[in-house]
Amino acid sequence: MFPMQFTNSAYRQMEPMFAPGPRGQVQPYRPRTKRRQEPQVGNAAIAALANQMSALQLQVAGLAGQARVDRRGPRRVQKSKQKKKNPSNGEKPKEKKKKQKQQEKKGSGGVIKKPRNRPGKEVRISVKRARQSTFPVYHDGAISGYAVLIGSRVFKPAHVKGKIDHPELADIKFQVAEDMDLEAAAYPKSMRDQAAEPATMMDGVYNWEYGTIRVEDNVVIDASGRGKPGDSGRAITDNSGKVVGIVLGGGPDGRRTRLSVIGFDKKMKAREIAYSEAIPWTRAPALLLLPMVIACTYNSNTFDCSKPSCQDCCITAEPKKAMAMLKDNLNDPNYWDLLIAVTTCNSARKKRAVSTSPAAVYDTQILAAHAAASPYRAYCPDCDGTACISPIAIDEVVSSGSDHVLRIRVGSQSGVTAKGGAAGETSLRYLGRDGKVHAADNTRLVVRTTAKCDVLQATGHYILASCPEGQSITVAATLDGTRHQCTTVFEHQVTEKFTRERSKGHHLSDLTKKCTRFSTTPKKSAPYLVDVYDALPISVEISTVVTCNDNQCTVKVPPGTTVKFDKKCKSAAQATVTFTSDSQTFTCEEPVLTAASITQGKPHLRSSMLPSGGKEVKARIPFPFPPETATCRVSVAPLPSITYEESDVLLAGTAKYPVLLTTRNLGFHSNATSEWIQGKYLRRIPVTPQGIELTWGNNAPLHFWSSVRYASGDADAYPWELLVHHTKHHPEYAWAFVGVACGLLVIAVCMFACACNRVRYSLVANTFNPNPPPLTALTAALCCIPGARADQPYLDIIAYLWTNSKVAFGLQCAAPVACVLIVTYALRHCRLCCKSFLGVRGWSALLVILAYVQSCKSYEHTVVVPMDPRAPSYEAVINRNGYDPLKLTIAVNFTVISPTTALEYWTCASVPIVEPPHVGCCTSVSCPSDLSTLHAFTGKAVSDVHCDVHTNVYPLLWGAAHCFCSTENTQVSAVAATVSEFCAQDSERAEAFSVHSSSVTAEVLVTLGEVVTAVHVYVDGVTSARGTDLKIVAGPITTDYSPFDRKVVRIGEEVYNYDWPPYGAGRPGTFGDIQARSTNYVKPNDLYGDIGIEVLQPTNDHVHVAYTYTTSGLLRWLQDAPKPLSVTAPHGCKISANPLLALDCGVGAVPMSINIPDAKFTRKLKDPKPSALKCVVDSCEYGVDYGGAATITYEGHEAGKCGIHSLTPGVPLRTSVVEVVAGANTVKTTFSSPTPEVTLEVEICSAMVTCASECTPPKEHVVATRPRHGSDTGGYISGPAMRWAGGIVGTLAVLFLILAVTYCVVKKCRSKRIRIVKS
């Protein structure tokens, strides 16, 4: 029933059952018995047996590479004639014989030879284990996908509809994932043994049903290419059988098949690795699988486009019929299928292909489709120094302008054989000088600008190459031993949009962004087809097509071409003859044959390097590299080493490639800076208290705040250290104080000098005065002035005043008496005013008011919250009399500024479009009245159209124009401006918006206890919200600030404030040189353009249109590197481009009123009434969130709850609700201090206590989160500084007083001096 494999030990245990009998002993014959009916077992038993067998298989796989010693020693050699074995053991004799031979292989000494590893067997075992946990899902009778049991759940893709084909799993209910294509459900416990173990999907190679799967850089490739609809949900396993993911779908990616999968890890966390072009591999119901009738027409007959009649379809057998069929069905939606059918010719027997994957086959069909067109030769201005008609002429070079990749169109076809079939990458199909189509292998195709380019891919006429910047481009190839090259002028300049890293290497990150690139995956849609027109004749030497022997001439016509030349015989006039058959002969006497040309039978692309040809589209061939919007991976530079020094952030490291460093302040003035850094670097960035945002490359922004101002010195030390500290902490206050003190000191010194001078003269006068003034007595009287101490008791002060100063005593007592009189006067007048309320009506009104107060059902809490999501949350403890406290937290979740915008126009890269020159040979031509009818302009939106007629061109030119007149030749040159083909991609298009008013919205989270309520507030009104028994009234927001100006520009994922020109006022080379408002980005019907086109007179060396124009204004604007709002927006706003929003701007505030019902409060039975509060600060570090620790002890009279919070502004305390017990209580809490000295008032219930302490400086002055404590505005002066300043001011004041008294005394004495007259 199950395949059985055993290890060596298991085989030895069962050896008596299989070993032969003793030598010479004949085994008794046992007749063949009928196999008895095996008992029916349940699903659980089957699952248990299957798991046991799987375990044995894994043991065999694990022991495959190990050698074991046979303990039984050497076994005897078996005879060549094998005995009949009893087949009752359920094993075939041949299989058993094979196993015995494997067991008998030994080396010398009885050691078994080491067998070789068998990784293929391990893979088969792992796939087999995955099958046991995989169940098909049926929908309308067909398998639509699969479900897999992994771990404790069953998984299947969400797009797989139907029921699981298992009785226990058919009716389970799945839960759909929100962000990925996955469903999961719990399965019955009885099936736990069948579940596979999960493993983590990493880069590497894994197994699935059809072969191997390679995972690399979030790209999953199916190496087998055999995935198909109906395989969605199949398991992806590693070699041990553990499931790492399930398949969702797939699609072609060039020549590969790329998958979309769901990957798991060991913890069963799922992630989706999606491919944008993948198709879900679910099988539709049988009813939808009916073949659709896809009708193409030919000769009024309808047929399936993918299966035309092979007698008429093959382009190699019947080229005229095939081309006519393609022409008749150009507008059919299934033209692509018809093109593949007529060029691949499915009826013919083909060689066995090397690769059978759908992507490889599809790529081969794309190359073979070029059989519907022919290569061509065109003018090249520089063929190694001279102009020529080249088979690899460069006809078109296209660049997005934002990267180095170029798309080059040449006249030859890459990857195509001479007959138009698919060939190797080095093959090149070209048109030779003889007018025949050739193919060359090993062409050594080279593309070069200033250096050699990397050729990424070459398909048909188009080459995709990554080139360095330059002013010209060269394409070179070796064709049949001859080296050809063509150089043309093309300014290749990369103008990158705003980017943060310039990495050219492999990206190891998972970060992606939208980008524009050339698609390398052909698709069956109109943008992937290009028109071809009638082939133009090329001039050839007459000897290549006509060979004459006397009068007999033979024309050699290459297959599928037309030969045309001028013939003049002796007896006939000159005539133009045409030949279309393979070979023809004519007779002409003295033939003069000139102007030979060959025209290909199949059409080719229109070229501006050739004259204008036919206007009718003959067919369409694949256009391999149209632009598309894709998801590109970007690099993420390693973060630098970040250290803090004083109030600065230091960045140090080494950047291997240029990385952009941007900074901005989070306040009103952003002061944005940006700098490209490469190599070793060390940058110092100052940090402000408002905060700073630092963005390194493509990493997430980092935010830093200055917790306190950095200052050296010590705030609690000697005067010189105090001076150093305060001059750095608050230099304006410190130096002002020093200046005032020095000024006062100078004045005091001057006064002291003057007083000393006066005293000297007074002493001299006293010496000669017999009655000197009472100077000594007056000076002594100053010392008798009574003093008073502020700490004396109040009654002692009153007694002193009564004794020494009756007036002062009266004034001291007058103040309280006056207060009593004022209060009495107010009460008396209040009684007169309220006399009517003292009766029955007054008492009734009083009772009603008291009843209303008692029936109040809610408690109102009001607060104003700053609108900054980066700010710390607001925390408070609600203390309501008679109730236990409640903790309230309010936090701003996000803010949104949404402007009202109007799209004025969009602009993109402008390109000129050139009509091939219309040459009038020996005649005159003129511009049409309606220039839009010119064939190059049809199907495209054009503006700034210029058309000029040039005379006297190409005199006697024998080239492509075929003009033989000297002066009558004229040419019409037409050039217009149009939008680039990249304009259809959102990331390459700039949109000009006018901004009107803005609406500001914020979401505030209110947490009361364990209940969280979200409230949306607005700038233009009050919001009323209800939570769980809460009523919240919030708003309006106090500001309508918006970072957007009146005019903004959006391009890609960035937004710019830019004053763009109005619609219709663009100028060449500036932003808005090409404008449109239509949503049809390929062909807008309201296109305005002015790119400075000027049509010039063509030179006579070749047929061409000469013109000049100005480079795209958008690219020039991007070259100026404007800074987007994501770098310059104030208040730390995050800018969203689509939709246009400003998020998380830290500006404004919102008032809130919260009505809390009585039901939220718990009534107190007893009031704890804390008393005898004492606070001891255990440690304190200022400038740090909750850097201080305090211990509060108190006595509780009753058991209950008390809220603890701070009453000091700017010093937050960790609010909490504490349990109070009767007796001694201790509470440990933390607080934040912005200053070196802190005095904190803490309230516990209704009791207050003061905590005071000196704090140490913080270790770091820069923090990564916004500080909770208040910012220091510059008014802080430490205690020691105040004491020293007070001492200095007091000393100076005393000195001034002494000097003033001395001056007055001396002045008085000198007024009574005597004159001393010398004899």
Swiss-Prot record:
**MF-aspect GO terms:** serine-type endopeptidase activity; structural molecule activity
Q: Name one Pfam family in it.
A: Peptidase_S3
Q: Where is the lipid attached (S-palmitoyl cysteine)?
A: 783-784
**According to the UniProt entry, where does the motif Nuclear localization signal sit in this chain?**
74-119
Output the PTM entry.
Structural polyprotein: Specific enzymatic cleavages in vivo yield mature proteins. Capsid protein is auto-cleaved during polyprotein translation, unmasking a signal peptide at the N-terminus of the precursor of E3/E2. The remaining polyprotein is then targeted to the host endoplasmic reticulum, where host signal peptidase cleaves it into pE2, 6K and E1 proteins. pE2 is further processed to mature E3 and E2 by host furin in trans-Golgi vesicle.
Which residues does the UniProt site feature Involved in dimerization of the capsid protein point to? 206, 239
Query: Which keywords are on file for this protein?
Result: Capsid protein, Cleavage on pair of basic residues, Disulfide bond, Fusion of virus membrane with host endosomal membrane, Fusion of virus membrane with host membrane, Glycoprotein, Host cell membrane, Host cytoplasm, Host endoplasmic reticulum, Host Golgi apparatus, Host membrane, Host nucleus, Host-virus interaction, Hydrolase, Ion channel, Ion transport, Lipoprotein, Membrane, Palmitate, Protease, RNA-binding, Serine protease, T=4 icosahedral capsid protein, Transmembrane, Transmembrane helix, Transport, Viral attachment to host cell, Viral attachment to host entry receptor, Viral ion channel, Viral penetration into host cytoplasm, Virion, Virus entry into host cell
Question: Which residues of this protein are annotated with the site description Cleavage?
Answer: 281-282, 352-353, 790-791, 858-859
EC number in record: 3.4.21.90
List, in alphabetical order, the GO biological process terms annotated in this UniProt record.
Answer: fusion of virus membrane with host endosome membrane; proteolysis; symbiont entry into host cell; virion attachment to host cell
Supply the name of the protein. Answer: Structural polyprotein
Q: Which organism is it from?
A: Alphavirus salmon subtype 3
